[in-house]
């Protein structure tokens, strides 16, 4: 009987804490054929509904427009990783930055804190417009 109670407690505490999952993404950003330097990229766990998204990692593109970020989160259900890109390519003097999101496929979710399978977003030309693109002043 004590063993059953202990197993129930362990199982319920696991459900409350969740399990550690990770994701990572790399890519290259260009603006009109030139490296997009210093562009802010953020990796989130997309929490749908009223719960705020969980920031997993953030960084900026280097002098070649390259970036690579990864992070982890404890969740009971599978994480829903997404990459937000904030930029000013072809933006003129408009306030705030252009923002768009790339959803990371579930096949790139890793168990544990170590990312073994990183999503390669490829080369992204920022000069065009993207589905769901908006503006963000407070990122």
Curated annotation (Swiss-Prot):
One of its GO terms (cellular component) is extracellular region. InterPro entries: Transthyretin-like, Transthyretin-like_sf. Keywords: Secreted, Signal. Pfam families: TTR-52. Coiled coil: none annotated. It is found in: Secreted. Residues 1-15 form the signal peptide. PANTHER family: TRANSTHYRETIN-LIKE FAMILY PROTEIN-RELATED, TRANSTHYRETIN-LIKE PROTEIN 5. Belongs to the nematode transthyretin-like family. This is Transthyretin-like protein 5. It comes from Caenorhabditis elegans.
């Amino acid at each position: 009987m004590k063993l059953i109670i202990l197993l129930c407690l362990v199982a319920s505490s696991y459900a409350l804490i969740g399990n550690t999952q990770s994701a990572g993404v790399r890519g290259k950003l260009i603006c009109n054929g030139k490296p997009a330097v210093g562009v802010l990229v953020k990796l989130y766990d997309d929490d749908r509904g009223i719960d705020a998204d969980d920031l997993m990692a953030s960084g900026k593109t280097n002098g070649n427009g390259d970036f690579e970020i990864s992070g982890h989160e404890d969740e009971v259900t599978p994480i829903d990783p997404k990459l937000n890109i904030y930029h000013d390519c072809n933006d003129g003097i408009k306030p705030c930055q252009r923002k768009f999101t790339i959803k990371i496929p579930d096949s790139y979710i890793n168990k544990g804190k170590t990312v073994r399978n990183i999503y390669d977003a490829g080369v992204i030309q920022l000069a065009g417009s993207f589905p769901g693109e908006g503006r963000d002043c407070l990122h």
